[in-house]
């Protein structure tokens, strides 16, 4: 049985991805003494949508997120806890099932213990294919899923902004950065002061996975759009330190996986022929992203991941020692699909492989 609809579905997915790449969604976990707001979720798209917080710091925190960069964030999803809440567990539990959140911040006064708890949670969510990333104060998490904000001495016209309170501004700025550009050198015109770093100190901080702001003598701006990843591996090279690269990879990986889960697995016979039709549809999706300027033209490939497929066959007791590569590709994998997609994100230094196992 063929796949008459899968190409159309991926074309629709590509169109949605291109639109979504212009701006992302910010999640905020807040605390407030207003009992009418507690344990509730609020969708905020403009200042007019901000709830009646008792704590003015929450209002400022949300307003900073709304500033964005080229665009404002698509929306802000705020989960409000009681000020008596012992931890952020309820907020994290809520966001665990919200697949459209791109960047998450803890409260404006997020403690070191709360920051650590979010890091642990974010890393576990990433293992479960979540694309949510955290923007946190002073957190050397060594992970592409955590942006480590270390800016100090920050002020705007309203007064001092702590590092934790600045995180919503950074999350909104990143979410408002189209995927075709980077947030590097993005200006923050509302800021009047930061602790200034020498060029050497700034370079050292960036190399250590810190998201910093610099003063160029005229304005305050982002030093470089990097996350907290420091330790690289053959599978996760230096390109994964860039927020822009990780954002694009997360979007592509999620789109392919969810589209396959929702429209392929269980809907069609998992035959070799159907896999080939699926692969052709995915290639069309990637080519659409090439045309939109997210991927380098002519760089995208998608094929059956023979290494993973052979490993799966061995785990089911199949002797693959005498099988050719083509026979491994055509082998029955029950309800499993193993695909290897290779893309080149514009501005990336190296080719990056995405393994999609469904």
Feature roles, as predicted:
Residues 1-71, 215-358:
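Structured, hydrophobic secondary-structure cores that serve as assembly/anchoring elements
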Residues 2, 27-32, 42, 93-262, ...:
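A glycine- and small-residue-enriched flexible loop/hinge signal that marks low-structured segments
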Residues 26-119, 130:
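An N-terminal, globular interaction/scaffold subdomain
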């Amino acid at each position: 049985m063929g796949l008459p609809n899968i190409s159309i579905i991926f074309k629709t997915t590509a169109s949605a991805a291109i639109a979504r790449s212009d701006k992302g969604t910010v999640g905020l976990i807040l605390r407030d003494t207003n009992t009418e707001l507690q344990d509730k979720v609020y969708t905020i798209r403009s200042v007019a949508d901000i709830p009646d917080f008792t704590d003015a710091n929450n209002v400022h925190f949300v307003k900073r997120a709304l500033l964005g960069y080229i665009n404002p964030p698509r929306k802000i999803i705020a989960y409000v806890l009681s000020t008596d809440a012992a931890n952020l567990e309820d907020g994290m539990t809520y966001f665990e099932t919200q697949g459209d959140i791109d960047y998450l911040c803890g409260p404006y006064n997020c403690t070191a213990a709360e920051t650590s708890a979010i890091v642990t949670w974010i890393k576990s969510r990433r293992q479960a294919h979540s694309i949510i990333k955290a923007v946190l104060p002073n957190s050397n998490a060594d992970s592409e899923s955590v942006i480590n904000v270390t800016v100090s001495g920050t002020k705007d016209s309203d007064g001092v902004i702590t590092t934790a309170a600045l995180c919503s501004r950074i999350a909104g700025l990143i979410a408002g950065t189209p995927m075709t550009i980077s947030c590097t050198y993005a200006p923050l015109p509302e800021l009047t002061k930061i602790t200034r770093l020498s060029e050497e100190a700034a370079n050292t901080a960036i190399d250590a996975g810190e998201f910093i702001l610099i003063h160029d003598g005229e304005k305050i701006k982002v030093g470089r759009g990097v996350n907290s990843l420091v330790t690289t591996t053959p599978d996760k090279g230096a390109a994964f330190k860039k927020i822009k690269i990780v954002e694009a990879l997360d979007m592509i990986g999620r789109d392919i996986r969810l589209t396959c889960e929702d429209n392929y697995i269980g809907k069609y016979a998992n035959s070799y022929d159907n896999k080939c039709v699926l692969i052709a549809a995915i290639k069309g999706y990637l080519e659409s992203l090439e045309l939109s300027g997210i991927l380098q033209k002519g760089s995208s490939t998608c094929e059956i991941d023979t290494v993973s497929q052979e490993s799966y066959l061995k785990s089911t007791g199949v002797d693959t020692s005498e099988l050719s590569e083509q026979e491994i590709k055509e082998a029955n994998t029950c309800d499993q699909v193993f695909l290897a997609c290779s893309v080149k994100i514009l501005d990336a230094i190296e080719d990056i492989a995405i393994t999609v196992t469904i």
